[in-house]
């Protein structure tokens, strides 16, 4: 595990609240990478964007009765130092304004994601 | 084991030093090394541990840096060392039986042994004895941490 510190991982999440079972793992992997001292960003785009609307992630429970929601994981990710970013163009697709986003999310454009993909040591997309 | 404090069913042995916010403990050994592990409260928060990865012997870590990572079904995160130093031994058993962390967090579930490099100063920031129990009590109340369940 020693050489991983500072490596850059970019996670691209294209799935959202319409497919709840596809929302957890990418966030979980991002938290794991952060725990391993990597520099991690999740980029939410396409349908992935809608889970960042205030109040949505709370509705998605990992396992019924567990009390652990997608919001729990997104909060854990922020606490762990994972950067959350969202595609500006996809926000328009979902009629979302900056004030609709949960706290801690940075809005980026398409050119930024290309730069980030080139800078990352590895890109994971879902 | 010597005197043990109980906080919401979680055991807090009073002879250890704690970094309450990071849920870790330290035992000062006779040879000047320290043993580091995660607390009963931590194992309870994580739930049954599925995987534990521990850093390697020889690595020097500053206080607050991870000495390993722990994953359960609902949580994954670092174990942050409460003291600076060099890792001189790791608990190899955790790779095959990570739930030692749940069953015996202060004994067989230890994580690493370290040769501390700044013990005299850093110990001042840790809590021990009744003070540790009190600080943990305040933390579990403030954060409404659930009562401990012990995996047998």
Predicted regions and their residues:
Chain A
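Anion (oxyanion) recognition and catalysis
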Residues: 34-35, 78, 117-118
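A glycine-rich helix N-cap at a beta->alpha junction
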Residues: 59-88
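Histidine-anchored nucleotide/phosphate-binding helix
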Residues: 23-38, 42
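Short, glycine-rich nucleotide/cofactor-binding loops
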Residues: 11-24
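Short internal beta-strands
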Residues: 39-45, 84-88
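Polar low-complexity intrinsically disordered regions
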Residues: 6-10, 121
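A short aromatic-anchored loop/beta-hairpin motif
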Residues: 76-77, 85, 98-100, 106-114, ...
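N-terminal beta-loop-helix "entrance" segment that forms/cooperates
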Residues: 48-62
């Amino acid at each position: 595990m020693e050489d991983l510190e500072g490596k850059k991982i970019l996670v691209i999440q294209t799935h959202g609240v319409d497919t709840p079972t596809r929302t957890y793992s990418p966030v979980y992997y991002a938290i794991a990478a952060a725990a391993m001292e990597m520099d991690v960003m999740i980029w939410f785009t396409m349908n992935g964007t809608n889970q960042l609307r205030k109040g949505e992630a709370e509705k998605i429970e990992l396992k019924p009765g567990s009390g652990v929601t997608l919001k729990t994981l997104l909060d854990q990710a922020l606490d762990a130092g994972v950067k959350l970013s969202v595609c500006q163009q996809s926000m328009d697709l979902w009629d979302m304004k900056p004030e609709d986003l949960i706290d801690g999310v940075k809005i980026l454009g398409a050119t930024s994601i290309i730069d980030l993909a080139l800078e990352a040591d590895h890109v994971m997309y879902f | 084991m010597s005197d043990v404090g109980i906080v919401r069913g979680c055991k807090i042995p009073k002879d250890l030093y704690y970094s309450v916010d990071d849920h870790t403990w330290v035992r000062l050994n006779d040879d000047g090394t320290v043993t580091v592990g995660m607390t009963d409260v931590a194992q309870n928060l994580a739930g049954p541990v599925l995987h534990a990865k521990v850093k390697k012997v020889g690595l020097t870590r500053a206080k607050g840096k991870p000495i390993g990572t722990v994953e359960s079904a609902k949580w994954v995160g670092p174990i942050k060392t409460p003291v600076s130093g060099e890792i001189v031994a790791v608990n190899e058993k955790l790779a095959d039986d990570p739930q030692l962390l749940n069953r015996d967090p202060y004994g067989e579930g230890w994580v690493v042994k370290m040769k501390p490099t700044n013990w005299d100063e850093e110990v001042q920031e840790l809590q021990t004895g009744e003070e540790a129990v009190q600080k943990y009590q305040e933390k579990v109340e403030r954060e409404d941490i659930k009562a401990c369940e012990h995996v047998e």
